[in-house]
Amino acid sequence: FPIQEDETALVIYSLWKHYEFSKDLEFIESIYNSLIKKAADFMVSYINTETGLPKPSYDLWEEKFGVSTFTASSVYGALVAAGKFSKLLGKVEHEKKYITTSEKVKEAILKYLWSDDKKMFYKMVNFEEGQPIYDGTMDFSSIYGIFRFRVLDVFDPKVVDSIKTMEEISGRIPVGGVPRYAGDVYHLKSHD
């Protein structure tokens, strides 16, 4: 069904960032069962048991359906956050479930979404009859998700290689910034 799973993951991840800043344990306790646990349990249930990746959903840009690196990374980060919330509240079984699932998602990201040949993370993968079909579009959200949600450290060779590859391919934009992905025409202005 048409969902955008990163929207679920980002709420849980952001709540952890809020907690790190506020230390408002009472608030977290008040929303743990109704929001954090329900969202985390959904993410655990929405994993492809054969690959370890989240099941397909729409990407960050709401354009393509599949398993994007950004979404998989956000699910990883959210499950780690859910594990931390569970530990904080003494819910050992929940913590174990969320952390174990997050570790499987991380392994699957590195197995299915990294390209040794291209030296970058794929935008997306789909599976047909068990075989991966890759979308090799250079998408800056892919590498952003990898280091933002701590799948890999920013100095990890895969992250460094991805950034170098993207810089080489994308070039520089005269006014600064980078395109969302290769071939992006969102708000593109003519050079005429």
Annotated model-derived regions:
Residues 1, 68-73, 88, 95-192:
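Extended ligand-binding clefts on enzyme/binding-domain cores
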